[in-house]
Amino acid sequence: ISTEYEEYAEELTAKIPLLKPLTLKLSIMPSDVAAAIDLGSNSFHMIVARINDGQIQVLDRLREMVQLAIGLDGRNRLSEESQQRALDCLARFGQRLRHIPPTQLRIVGTNTLRMARNSAEFLARAEAVLGHSIEVISGPEEARLIYLGVMHSVAAIPGQRLVVDIGGGSTELIIGEQFEPLHLTSLKMGCVSISRACFDDGRITEARLHKAELIVQLRLEPIGEEYRDLGWQVVTGASGTIKAVQEVVVREGWSREGITLEALRRLRGALL
C-alpha cells in the first residue's frame, strides 16, 4: 500500500470532493472561499479553501481527535461526554466559519452518526453550535467522496487503483480508474470499533489479535472474490491509521516506502 501524501494530505481525502461540487452545484464565483467539515468517527476535520477556476487553494485546515465512536454504548447511544467533546470541537470550528455563507459550506457526518440511535438529538445541538445544517451521508457516498479526494491528491496512473480508507467506525474500499469509481464498498468496521471489541483495555495478546483478524476476515469475505476479479494496479491508503502504520514500518526498517505484507507480518510479531 502506498500513501502518496504530503504532511497533511490525508486530511484532504474526504474534503476536496466536498468542495468540488460547490463550484458546479452551488454556483460559487471562481475566486470565492468555501469550506467543508467531516465529522468522522475518530476525528473531525475542517478545510477552508479558495476555489479559483476549478482549482482548490487550501487556506486553512483543522483536525481534532474527538473519538466520537468511543461514546457509543451497548444500545448505540452517544454518551453525553462524547457529545460534549464533539460540540466543543465544533464551537472552535464555527469561529472559522463566521464569514462563510451556507451556500459555500458542506458539513457531513459518517458512520457513527449513521449508527447512533440519538443521532438526531446530537445533530440538533451540533447545528445550533455551528449555525449550519449537517448532512449524514451514506456509506457508499462516503466511499465515493474518499475516492475522488484521493484522485485529487495523487499522480495519475494507467489502469485501476484500489483505495483503502480505515476510519474510526467504517472501512471503505474503492476500485476505480482515473476519476471514475467503478466499485465501492463501505464496511462497518474501523480502528475504534475493532479496538473496543478486541483491545478495550489496551492489552494485545495472540488470542485477542486472532479475534480481531477473524472479525476483519469475516467482513471482507463477501466482497473478496468480486474485488479480486476486478483487479487493480496499485493500492493507495487514505487514512490516518494507514499513515501511522507506514510511519512505523519505515522507521523500523521493515519497508523502504509504503506498506508491504512482510512489513505487516513483522509489525504483528513486534506487537506480541
Language model: regions and residue ranges:
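Aromatic- and glycine-enriched glycan-recognition loops and surfaces
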Residues: I37
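Conserved Rossmann-like nucleotide-cofactor binding loop
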Residues: N42-F44, G169
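Helical "lid/coupling" subdomains associated with nucleotide-phosphate turnover
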Residues: D32-A34, V48-D53, V66-Q67, G71-P102, ...
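Short, low-complexity, charge-dense intrinsically disordered segments
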Residues: T3-K25
